[in-house]
Amino acid sequence: KHNMNTEKLVLSLKETYNDVDIIKVNNFDISTINNYQKVGLASGIYWGKFSKNIEDLLNKILDSDIKNLFFIYTSGVGKVRYEKKLIKKLEEKNKICLGIFSCKGFDNYGPFKLIGGINKGKPNEKDTQNLIIFFKNIY
């Protein structure tokens, strides 16, 4: 079971920006994509990349008319090299990356399971506040 780190962050946005649509990837209908001027994708990082569902949706969005995207992710190890690949992917499709927000999240996968996990209590209130500031700048 995932630790829901990223979901906790995203749901905190809804408290401040109640007009924002937050849709779980499995419930998103790609045919509605053009109803939006900007789209954000949020995921935990699993072995160095977004979840497969988010990757699949991103590839569909890259083939749509949507130009403006932003990303939110949590990771046990913090910032990942994945961002460079992600930005390159967007640039190749003439998309604009409005920003990428990341913070550490509780991680008890792989070797971290042996020590009871790392980053207990993350994301925390400070991370939530930083996300709201990030979002305000792109909203």
Model segments located where?
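Short conserved loop adjoining the S-adenosyl-L-methionine
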Residues: S31-I33
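Conserved SAM/SAH-binding loop
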Residues: V25-D29
